[in-house]
Design a protein with these regions (language model features):
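The feature marks the mature, well-folded catalytic cores of soluble enzymes
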Residues: 1-214
């Protein structure tokens, strides 16, 4: 029985469609940045603007002595309690300052402020790249309500991939068990879309950036 001409035309188009191969989509270029680069050439300015945008507290200091003075003044003005410092370089730095801090794990459950270094600062996102490889470990950057990061201008890189490359070069195949980005205070809006700071980590993130370009 002959098919209806209109049905025959439809079936013919279907058969042609099944035999016709569509061209493959172009290969994506994963090496190309998907974000436009900032026109600002000074990475410290790029970082600071993004960091402040994400509710971080930023201080620029010219040297370690100014860092001691500024941090001691901040601790006094804000009445910082139970400050913990575990990294030897920071313990040595603040040993003669007016900052009172604990260098052991004694009463760590009371920790209010943790002072650590970082692996790098990411300018594009305004983030601190933290790892568990330092003596601060995992807890000191996460548990206290206030996290203070001490960094140098030479540690600023533009993007996340640049920071991860620094870690790869530094540690090789023995990568730290924890590598994370801190972008402003910890936050969540899971419940009724209400923003809550300090949900899964520090309620305040403070960065002191030391100019070591000279």
């Amino acid at each position: 029985m002959a098919l209806n001409p209109s049905k025959e035309a439809i079936l013919k188009r279907i058969r042609q469609g099944l035999t016709r191969r569509n061209p493959l989509p172009p290969e994506p270029n994963f090496s190309t940045d998907i974000y436009s680069r900032s026109e600002e050439s000074d990475l410290s300015i790029v970082f600071a603007s993004q960091f402040i945008h994400h509710k971080g507290e930023f201080y620029f200091v010219e040297n370690k002595k100014e860092l001691e003075i500024q941090l001691a003044q901040l601790a006094k003005n804000r009445n910082f309690q139970h400050i913990y410092v575990w990294e030897k370089s920071l313990i040595d730095l603040f040993s003669n300052s007016d900052i009172s801090f604990e260098t052991s794990e004694k009463d760590f459950s009371l920790a209010g402020v943790g002072i650590t270094t970082c692996e790098a600062l990411i300018a594009r996102t305004g983030s601190a790249l933290i790892s568990s490889a330092t003596l601060s470990g995992r807890r000191l950057a996460i548990y206290p309500h206030i996290h203070v990061v001490i960094a140098k201008t030479s540690q600023i890189v533009y993007d996340i991939k640049d920071g991860l490359e620094l870690i790869r070069q530094k540690y090789g195949n023995a990568l730290p068990s924890m590598i994370c980005l801190e972008t402003g205070p910890s936050r969540t809006a899971d419940i009724e879309k209400t923003l809550v700071l300090g949900a899964h980590g520090p309620k305040e993130l403070i960065v002191f950036l030391i100019d070591d370009s000279i």
